[in-house]
Amino acid sequence: MKHFDHIVVGSGASGLTATLLLALQGRKVLLLEKAPQVGGSLARFRRGGLPFDTGFHFTGGLTEHGLLSRMLRALGLADEVEPQFMAADKAHRFVFESVGRTIDLPCGLSAMRQKLKADFPGEQVAVERYFDLVEKVCAQTGTMDLSRLTEPSARLDEEYVSLKDVLDGLTGNALLKGVLSGLSMCYGVKPSEMSFASHSRVCYDLYESTARFKAGGETLIEAFQRHFRGLAVETACSCWIEKFDDIQNDQAGKALLNTGEEVAFGSVLLTIHPRQILKLLPPEQISKAFVERVMAFEPSLGFFTLFGTLDGGSHDDTVSSITSLFPLTDFEALLDPAYRGEQALVIVGNEEAVGGVRRRTATILEPAFPQAMEPWQDTFTGRRPPAYQAYKQERVAAILKHLVRYDARYGEHFQTTDSASVLTYRDYLHSFDGSAYGIKQKLGQYNLIGRLPVRNLFAAGQSALLPGVAGAMMSSFIVVRSMVGRDAFNRFMGTRLCN
């Protein structure tokens, strides 16, 4: 029987980060991935030779002192990825269709303050107060700064108040509230359900800058894999844990894999959905309260996605800005699973060199919730019924109609390459429900992070801390500290941050 110091389950951003952090400290690590390839939603797929991003479309935190940049430096990966930043004057373009207003958001909190005060001359106090609060939350959050990761953290007052309540207290201007809620598409929770603290932590680095990696998330996967080769890391794809065994003194000693192999371990980090974690825990080791807590977690937003090309004409703005079309200013409605009006769209353009030819691609994201997929929950890719195919055709037609109404050039130049539903993501990524951000990060909720009832099992991932690549990676920094011991991890981080 093989023995590993640690097993990491799931090879998305969190699992890759944890594996490298553990291996860099001399640990022997087994990385398990249920899919045929590592990387999760960081990976790309290709149609007609053109690459498209599966789930990692853009991120914040890639400025010199940004959180993601600092994590990449600590991992030794910073020089192996190349950020491509959105336009400084309009990283995000918000089009509020019901009121006929377009608001461009520049990079940098200072520039954004000035821009929004100019756009909303009667709301200058509200704008200043909002950004003051965002900066206050992030300054008081130790995990937003790797050099302060070892500091004890306390829950802030802003953990207990919703984004909606804060915005309602600042202004009665519906459009301004819509602008300040716009990046909620990056975590998929209604303003009344999201704490202002969590909203601030997600948005802060996106306000400072928005970027993608050249060659997409694949370049990050490849960087991790290069570093694994010189370390005690073994990777197994199409492989997962069926059950834990040899439970003694509230600790598991070995895991039975789907291959029939048994492996022994010191500890296991599970970067998968909390419901999937729950299925792995021996029933006699968990309380009714623990089960109820996990079962109460709700799915976050997912997306119906249209992939295509934009050859011909001028579409520079689709490459340099993230454009969001919002039919309403009310994000309580737009992010409600029960909403049946016209959906928002997020347009992410890119430019790729294929065979020496520059091609423009566009990924169109339309909000969709796992709940809407209930009629087809028990079906799988390639074996869906006609009603599901009709649903996909209906969504594609609605998205194309919406795009052309916004800009007639899409009718002339956009060519559909493929489409994906929430179920497509679920099956392709081997995820629990196909949601984009794991569980909803709800006000007053205690996520599953760190040590589990089986005491040498741990939880991390974007459902554990914050959604997105940076949140998933940061959860691994926090939990690996518990796995290897605070003092040892602090010494390790001291050397990495000095490099």
Region roles according to the model:
Residues 98-194:
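Rossmann-like flavin
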Residues 63, 152-163, 204-226, 387-395:
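Short beta-strand to alpha-helix junction loop
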Residues 312-420:
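C-terminal segments that line or cap access tunnels to active or ligand-binding sites in enzymes
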Residues 175-187, 405-466:
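A glycine-rich dinucleotide-binding beta-alpha-beta segment and adjacent secondary-structure elements
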Residues 462-487:
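A conserved FAD-binding loop/helix module that cradles the flavin
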Residues 2-129:
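N-terminal glycine-rich phosphate/pyrophosphate-binding loop and immediately adjacent elements
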Residues 242-357:
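Mid-domain catalytic core of redox enzymes
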Residues 200-253:
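Helical element adjacent to the flavin cofactor pocket in flavoenzyme catalytic cores
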